Amino acid sequence: MTQDIHDKAERSGSPHPLRWRILGFLGVAQLMLILDVTVVAIALPNIEADLDLSRQAVTWTVSAYTLTFGGLMLLGGRAADLFGAKRIVLTGLLVFTAASLVTGFAGSDGLLLGGRVAQGLGAALMSPAALSLVVHLFEGDERNKALGVWSALGGGGAALGVLLGGLLTAGPGWPWVFYVNVPIGLVILAALARMLPHQKAAAPRPRLDLLGALLVTASSAALIYAFIRAGDDGWLTIATAALVLLAAVGYVAFVARQKTAKSPMMDVALLARRPVATGTFLILMATALMIAVFFLGTFYFQHAEDFNALQTGLLFLPVAIATMLGANLTGRAIATAGARRLAVIGLTTAAVGMAVPAVSMHPATVVAGTAIAGAGTGAMFVVASATALGQVAPHESGIASGIVSTFHEFGASIGAAVISSVAAVSLVGDTLSGFTNGFVLAAVAAAVSAAAAAVLTPGRER
């Protein structure tokens, strides 16, 4: 029935009549993927105690998901273009849901980390394919509004994850931060299987560039791991330098491979386009700043103020609301105000918010400042997505979405690694100077990015 509705709409040239309902289900699915970073971070102390995890295993509980999610994102985007976004969305959602069940049952670090890797694989398949569907189903001003809804859910998801993680950890226990994905995932899977239109493959015998996927995944993994190690050991180490060099060599090899492969993962010239390049820069900065907010706020509340996980989660509720509000308002205003102006406003707002706790460190100022910063970063998610994806061809929407989502994960890794290094003195001692320095760095980074956005972001078309 739903396919008949889609076919009639396609023949008449009208938009898909179920597009907003589809967006709702896709948005909730994306929300699960974003939640799975911060919801786990709050539960880590309990997981560590129950499974007797080493410090390295605790770190990998978060980074294994981020590494796999970010490293395989381009593969997911290319698969959506070749095999159809519907097929890849459903496959990724099924893998993520099953992996969540396995991870919740984990009784050892091996099963826990294996489940996290599998969750990352499912997320890497689903996220770019879902964003590709959003771009495909909506046009013009409606697309900007849809991206606003999408970004509000994704941007607010990280803050909501802190609240949900605190509630679940304090209630039924840490396994439920994973179990909660299972019933939600199954409902969304059944709904999308019925509502999403069938799509034809891009070619009679579609192929994936597996060597290219291996190169970009390994390079991305090496780079993200370098950031993680730098947060613990410092930048001036042989291991960190070797990982950065390995990543650079891998990316060069990837570019060379894309120019010779019969079925390349992406047209490398796509990143040379000003809108795409600017959009990826903006999404990287927005995510890095967002992670800085949650990292600094979470550890400040729990280490310096001795709040528990549930109290910390409740304190982040204003941040979640502000993030979603900033994204939603920006989605409504971008068609008239333009991406450049809103990019500058969003980053300036984030800089002001970060500066508040840097000047005066107190629970009230941290909540107020991070909420202001959250509104700014929420706006940035919309501007970045609209800038990078607004002018790509339909057959490129999957890989372009993959690029945007990849830099989203890169931003999370960079933000966590750099901020944790700057704030390290406050994580192991009683001083607040590390937290102050972290907020100062975030404020300066946002201000510099605002100046860069004023120059780099394309102006409104006339």
State the predicted function of each range.
Residues 80-87, 143-145, 202-208, 264-267, ...:
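Interfacial helix-loop-helix linkers and transmembrane-helix boundary segments
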Residues 2-194, 328-330, 336-379, 383, ...:
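Transmembrane-helix bundle of Major Facilitator Superfamily
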Residues 194-195, 231, 452-456:
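Short, hydrophobic alpha-helical segments
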Residues 109, 173, 200-205, 230-236:
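Membrane-interface helix caps and helix-loop-helix hairpins in membrane proteins
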